[in-house]
Each structure stands twice: as C-alpha cells, then as structure tokens.
C-alpha cells in the first residue's frame, strides 16, 4: 500500500525512531510501513491519522485508483 508517511515524518524532522516512540511501535515497523513491506493495522492507521491530523485515506493509498461515484 502506498503511503505518505516518510514525507509527513520528514516535514516534522522526526527520525523513524521518534515516530516509532510516538506510535509505541518499533523503528523497524515504521520502516516497513514506509517502504510498503507492511500494512499497518487499523488501530495503528488511526493513530497515524490522529498524530498527523489527517484522514487515513490522506496518508494511505491502496493504488486502486478509485474515483468517487457521482
């Protein structure tokens, strides 16, 4: 799953370890999410959304290219 986590983290000048501490996960978990090797659990996705004050879908993109139906 594509995500903007690395960009959002960099905008705040946080290291992976600092973000991991804020989320109560390992630095390796943050790295795996950033590189698309691991998709976060729903509770973790909500934590990320709250931390960055964004909606989950603003952070994560499933790559499906869904358009809103009109």
Regions found by a protein language model. Give the residues of each.
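Short, charged recognition helix plus adjacent turn
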Residues: 50, 60-70
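Short, basic-rich loop-to-helix N-cap that marks the start of a DNA-contacting helix
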Residues: 37-47, 66
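Recognition helix of helix-turn-helix/homeodomain-like DNA-binding domains
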Residues: 25-38
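Short basic helix-loop element that most often maps to the first helix and adjoining turn
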Residues: 3-22
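Residues in the helix-turn-helix
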Residues: 18, 29, 58
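DNA major-groove recognition helix of helix-turn-helix/homeodomain DNA-binding modules
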Residues: 43-58
């Amino acid at each position: 799953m594509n995500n903007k986590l690395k960009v959002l983290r960099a905008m705040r000048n946080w290291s992976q370890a600092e973000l991991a501490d804020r989320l109560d996960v390992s630095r390796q978990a943050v790295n795996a999410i950033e590189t698309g090797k691991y998709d976060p659990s729903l509770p973790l996705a909500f934590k990320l959304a709250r931390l960055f004050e964004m909606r989950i879908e603003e952070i994560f993109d499933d790559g499906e290219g869904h358009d809103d139906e009109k």
